[in-house]
């Protein structure tokens, strides 16, 4: 039987760990709620941008924009991997890497130049461990990505695409579907595609398909602003989804750790009680034996 004092010491240690994991769970829950509110607001903004694009498409415009053009030959592509700066979030980062690695491998088999960028220390280190070096590393993002920071990254990608330095941009991130479901996905953000593709989701269920719109100063000038903004908003939404999913993963992981610690404490308490009972019984038997020896 294990020593009662050692069991009690271990039980106290696990209780302290449970306090830490419980605190981290509460912090992750609070951060999740804040991140969720920001993601919901960004979703509403994205929908409005999509509606504007839909109306431009409904206007029957014959317009061209560099971001809408499909390249006949892809020579250079960038892959942006969105991971976290911190751990203790379950399989969040492992899932991202499992999704990113096959895509990077397949792209390198068919495209001459594949450049990998990463957001988050865990992503950078995870890729490096697997022999993949990253060119750009974005380590400033935590649980609340700022639009200004993402906009700078987006403008860099836009400039590279327009000047022909890259022909494609893939983003690997965890898409937030619900509190119980988050999925690591890959989205091609550049090129954006056609106006018609942009308008598919916005036109569903709309009741103003027969309305006529007047664009001032012109539909073309609006398009020049809307198309780059559409890309920036989409990239920002990827960062927000990743942030929400990270907090959900951490919240679930810490909740599981807290519950496991509770189960271990119960088991150790039972073992401690048995050990203590055995120790007391032994001491009583020693006393009885001593008394009998004195009487004899």
UniProtKB/Swiss-Prot annotation:
Protein role: Produces ATP from ADP in the presence of a proton gradient across the membrane. The gamma chain is believed to be important in regulating ATPase activity and the flow of protons through the CF(0) complex.
MF GO annotations: ATP binding; proton-transporting ATP synthase activity, rotational mechanism
Family membership noted in the UniProt record: Belongs to the ATPase gamma chain family.
Membrane topology: Peripheral membrane protein
Cross-referenced Gene3D superfamilies: 3.40.1380.10, ATP synthase, gamma subunit, helix hairpin domain (1.10.287.80)
InterPro entries from the UniProt entry: ATP_synth_F1_ATPase_gsu, ATP_synth_F1_gsu
Organism this protein belongs to: Rhodopirellula baltica (strain DSM 10527 / NCIMB 13988 / SH1)
Entry-linked SUPFAM superfamilies: ATP synthase (F1-ATPase), gamma subunit
Compartments where located: Cell inner membrane
Protein name: ATP synthase gamma chain
NCBIfam families, sorted: ATPsyn_F1gamma
Subunit relationships: F-type ATPases have 2 components, CF(1) - the catalytic core - and CF(0) - the membrane proton channel. CF(1) has five subunits: alpha(3), beta(3), gamma(1), delta(1), epsilon(1). CF(0) has three main subunits: a, b and c.
Keyword line: ATP synthesis, Cell inner membrane, Cell membrane, CF(1), Hydrogen ion transport, Ion transport, Membrane, Transport
PANTHER family according to UniProt: ATP SYNTHASE GAMMA CHAIN, ATP SYNTHASE SUBUNIT GAMMA, MITOCHONDRIAL
GO CC, one annotated term: proton-transporting ATP synthase complex
